[in-house]
Amino acid sequence: DPKETWAFITWTIFAIYLHTRKKKKLEGINSSIVASIGFLIIWICYFGINLLGIGLHSYGSFTSN
């Protein structure tokens, strides 16, 4: 299911973000890059996955008639 896969990717990216915030060596620009990637992935999950129209959660997809 694409929505579950992208939700897992989102959780993974933000887990990486939390780890980069805790490490002093990775703080700063690295954590901001990871946060920006996570923000883009959330937009993909929110809008992009419904355009696929496949999977168990395809009730919100757009139909092409």
Curated annotation (Swiss-Prot):
Keywords: Chloroplast, Cytochrome c-type biogenesis, Membrane, Plastid, Thylakoid, Transmembrane, Transmembrane helix
Keyword Nuclease: no
Residue stretches in coiled coil: none
Bilayer topology annotation: Multi-pass membrane protein
UniProt-annotated location(s): Plastid, Chloroplast thylakoid membrane
Lineage top rank: taxon: Eukaryota
InterPro entries recorded: Cyt_c_assembly (IPR002541), Cyt_c_biogenesis_CcsA/CcmC (IPR045062)
GO BP terms in the entry: cytochrome complex assembly
UniProt key word Phosphoprotein: no
Any one Pfam family match given in the protein's UniProt record, by short name: Cytochrom_C_asm
Single annotated GO MF: heme binding
Main location: plastid
TM annotation in the entry: 5-19, 33-53
A GO cellular-component term linked to this record: chloroplast thylakoid membrane
Free-text function comment from the UniProt entry: Required during biogenesis of c-type cytochromes (cytochrome c6 and cytochrome f) at the step of heme attachment.
Assembly mode: May interact with Ccs1.
Similarity field: Belongs to the CcmF/CycK/Ccl1/NrfE/CcsA family.
Protein name, UniProt field: Cytochrome c biogenesis protein CcsA
